[in-house]
A protein has these predicted regions:
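Conserved N-terminal subdomain of the carbohydrate kinase-like
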Residues: 29-137, 141-149, 295-297, 301-302
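Short pre-catalytic strand/loop immediately N-terminal to key active-site residues, enriched for Gly-Thr
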Residues: 44, 231-245
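Conserved phosphate/ATP/ADP-binding segment of small-molecule kinases
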Residues: 149-231, 241
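Charged C-terminal helix
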Residues: 265-305
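Polybasic, lysine-rich low-complexity intrinsically disordered segments
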Residues: 2, 6, 18-21, 27
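Short, small-residue alpha-helix embedded
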Residues: 178, 241-264, 268
Length: 305
């Protein structure tokens, strides 16, 4: 038989190169391809949560395996919506994955609707984490200085417990202030203050932290801390208005890049630039801010490695 391992194959106008070595040593397995489990809600319309993560993570060459926490007809910012809580069904859903013996290179948690769901996520991590698994936690709790009405004081405390399991966490400025007990303000942050908050978060366990959405005059900044590598402020020019789902776009890129071994600062810069460009395209197309970021229009521009 002809050796095709190094052959180039043309498919739908694209060129692919087969892997030089067989990953499975001749045995079929669910676990030969990189996979990320994404625990989040599913909104049918509005470009957020799982409907954002599925295409972006897949485009970056990693299989995206959703764990829905709830099903919504559309993003809650649109007002009237259908909502179906999946808390009571999550355990049975996850149980089937246990039977399949699935292994994950990445686990991502996003918006969680109750203390019970936070407990389930912790249980999921304990069950499926291995030495090769990267855990990315987006501690979705609020924005613009306000904690979401669904988040009780008890849930905020539980979120603090959840991030202890993270390798990477991506809180926005509001969430960072809540987690560290820091008074929120809309601007004028000194780098030393951001460093102090990032250090507090790192003491809980995460190796890599990015505090997102920090207003800095005409810029939006993301403050990065990596244990053993120091800190960095990554800025992009402000663009358009705030939009739903930008955090989900950002964390999806960070997660796929982490599994693919991309440098963290490089990944943060890539994600920041992509979100900004998506906002500009959305403004150009006159898409309402509640509809999220039109990332589909520019997905092909996203660097895969």
């Amino acid at each position: 038989m002809k050796d095709i391992r190094n052959c180039k194959v043309n498919f739908c106008g694209r060129e692919y190169r087969n892997a030089k070595k067989s990953r499975g040593n001749g045995k079929m397995s669910h676990n030969h391809q990189k996979k990320i489990a994404v625990i989040n809600d599913m909104s049918g319309f509005g470009r957020c949560s799982l409907t954002v993560s599925l295409p972006i993570i897949s485009y970056l060459g990693v299989q995206c395996c959703p764990v829905p926490t709830s099903i919504l007809s559309n993003h809650m910012a649109l007002g009237d919506y259908f909502f179906d809580d999946y808390t009571d069904r999550m355990e049975a859903y996850i149980g089937k994955w246990k039977k399949l013996g699935l292994k994950f290179e990445g686990i991502v948690s996003g918006f969680l609707g109750s203390k019970e769901q936070i407990e389930m996520v912790i249980g999921f991590m304990k069950e499926f984490c291995s030495g090769r698994t990267k855990v990315i936690i987006d501690p979705v709790m609020g924005d613009n200085g306000r904690i979401y009405s669904t988040y009780t004081e008890e849930m905020c405390e539980e979120m603090g417990r959840l991030i202890e399991y993270g390798d990477i966490i991506t809180p926005n400025l509001t969430e960072c202030c809540r987690l560290t007990g820091t008074a929120y303000r809309g601007g004028g942050w000194e780098e030393a203050e951001l460093h102090g908050m990032a250090e507090k978060l790192s003491m809980w366990g995460p190796e890599k932290i990015v505090i997102t959405g920090i207003p800095q005059g005409e810029f939006i900044a993301n403050y990065v801390l990596e244990k053993g590598k120091g800190t960095k402020m990554i800025q992009v020019h402000k663009a358009g208005t705030e939009r739903s789902g930008t955090g989900d776009v950002f964390s999806s890129i960070i997660a796929a890049d982490a599994v693919n071994g991309v440098d963290f600062c490089r990944s943060v810069k890539k994600a920041s630039d992509f979100v900004r460009q998506g906002i500009l395209v959305s403004e150009e197309l006159q898409i309402p801010s509640t509809d999220g970021v039109c990332f589909e229009e520019i997905l092909y521009t996203l660097e895969r490695k």
